[in-house]
């Protein structure tokens, strides 16, 4: 699934109103609560300096591959991640996001392709990281922080809940 464009990324987000306790009727008004049904993966790569110079890359792409990571099917599926910055400008920092189907025993392989600043074609070898089986929960953002020289080096993983926002009592009036 191509989530490389902002439009495709946002179309992959899904909200659901679940359970009878979330939907109530009072005074000719229906009150309900939406809950995200997906998990978010954020990949942050900070390329290391070489000697005194900072190594910069452009046209960096990130892809996740794994069984059921989009639909829950038992077959292999891929997600092309959204690059959150201007991918045509060389930089030493790159961030990607995607929406992942939550579930138990989920694993994936991250593959990163990159072009060294000043080069005309991508490097021959992709950088990879394999996430072993893990339970990904809905409404969570899993932030993977990497440094890199020739390979991806995982420095931390943070799990954060989606941020809640307050909604005004009467945000939209039908009258």
Tell me what each language-model feature is.
Residues 1-56, 90-96, 100-104, 109-112, ...:
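Short, low-hydrophobicity acidic/polar segments
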Residues 50-84, 169, 173-174:
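Short, ordered, surface-exposed loop/turn motifs in non-cytosolic proteins
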Residues 84-90:
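Active-site/ligand-binding surface loops and adjacent short beta/alpha elements
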Residues 119-126:
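Beta-sandwich strand segments
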